[in-house]
Each structure stands twice: as structure tokens, then as C-alpha cells.
Amino acid sequence: MEHIHDINFQEFSKDPIGTIDRFRWKNEVTPFSNILFPIVCSFGYLALIYGLQIFMKNKKEIKLHGFAMFHNLFLCLLSLLMFLGIVIPMAKYSFPHGLYNIICKPIDSGLVQFSYYIFYLSKVYEFIDTIIQVLRKKSLLFLHVWHHFITLWLVWANLKYDTGCQWVDISANCFVHIVMYFYYFQTERGINPWWKKHITTCQIIQFIVDMSSHLAWHFYDTQGNHNSNYCSGTWATSAFSDFVILSFLGLFIQFFVKAYKKKSSIKKKTN
């Protein structure tokens, strides 16, 4: 089957399923695969949010309830579609191929790769999370800005160098985002679900799962005695991923302790 590396919207409208089935990321050919895209978007993101903070300094907050409700519901549903687009094919693939292949030589085309690609583009759309916070004049945590800035680079690098275990990272992130954006959607409706704290717990578990998959990748890649000798991807990309994931893990644990553990200790003292 001949792969396609570009999304021709005319062809896509005529045969969306066939287009997705034949899709495969190709460096410098697939739209926005060039390194200029993450450079412009990530540094443009920093310039925009800090410029907006200066602009909003002496202005009243902008509520944005209607837009924020749509934004969060859209990302919740998109995350669900991407999650299913990766997990269902990978589950079918895993039974005959085993653990080594799903970590080192997973599906590299079709719905899984198309879902990766949409996930990559969605990281730019998610910059709107920060824009909403700035327009509402809420303080920005380093964790928030770092997460949005570096995740685009993380996804781009893993797509470019085709890291075998990236499906674990992406599907885990999609699952967490289903829960997280549904929570934010509910809060925009005036409902405050009781399980807010557990979102951070899920995020911490996500990074532990991510690191486990990368450790498995490193283990298999050092063996050199499998079907194709080595895992798909590079050590440099995996090391970069390890650094980013560990930074997220540390920052989210720090946030959890500050936001929830200290609050519970204060409550105990007042009681």
C-alpha cells in the first residue's frame, strides 16, 4: 500500500477513511514537520503570553465563559478520539506481536500515526489554555508555561525520530486530558466536581507510566538480539524525553504537595 505524507483536503473530503489508513509522517514533507514550526510556535507562545500580561496589567479581566466552555469540551472530545485512535489499533496489534514489538516496533502508519499527527497539532491549539488564564488575569505557574512550551518539542522530536514507545506517552496524555478538560468544562458550567485533586494524581501516574515505557525501550534497545536488532528511535530523543518527563514528574509532585497536602495539614490544625 502506498503511503501518503501530506493531507490533501480535497482527497480527504472524498475518502477520509482511505486517507487516514494510508497516512504516515515524513520529515520535511508532512505539513508542519519542519523544525521551524515548533521554533516559531513555542517562542511565539512565550512572546504572546508575556506580551498579553503587560497589555492586561491595567485592564479588567475578560470572563470568556462561553468560549472557555466550548474550548474545554472540544479538547475533551478530541482527546477521546485520539485516545481511541491509538489504543484500539495498538491493542489489536499487541496480541500477535508481543511486548518487544509494541515498545520498539509499533504501528508506523494509518490511524495510529494520523492520531499522533493530530495530537502534535493539538499542542499548539492548547496554547489557548494559557491565553484564557492571562485574559482572566490569573497568575501563571512555571509548571503551566513549561508544560505547554516543551510538550510541542517533545512530540515533534518523537515523531521526527519515530520513537517506538511514543504511543504510550501520547495515549496516556490523551486519557488524562479527557478527564481534565471534562473537569474544566464542568467548572465553566458552574459545577465543581469533587475529584479535582485526583486529576493531579492521574498526571503523576501518567509520567510514571511514561518513564516505565522509556525504560523498557532502553532495555530492549541494548539487547541487540531481536528481529530488527534495535528499537525504532534514537537514544538522544529518548534521553530528551526522559528529561522532560522527569521534570514534569518533579513539578507535578511539588504542585500536589503545595496544593493539597499543606491544605489538609492546615485543616487538621484548625480542627
Swiss-Prot record:
Membrane topology: Multi-pass membrane protein
Annotated function: Fatty acid elongase with strict substrate specificity for monounsaturated fatty acids, in particular 16:1 (delta-9) to produce the unusual 18:1 (delta-11) fatty acid.
Protein name: Fatty acid elongase A
Gene Ontology molecular function terms on file: fatty acid elongase activity
Catalyzed chemical reaction(s): a very-long-chain acyl-CoA + malonyl-CoA + H(+) = a very-long-chain 3-oxoacyl-CoA + CO2 + CoA
Keyword flag Transport: no
Keyword Calcium attached: no
Taxonomic lineage of the native organism: Eukaryota, Amoebozoa, Evosea, Eumycetozoa, Dictyostelia
An individual GO BP term: very long-chain fatty acid biosynthetic process
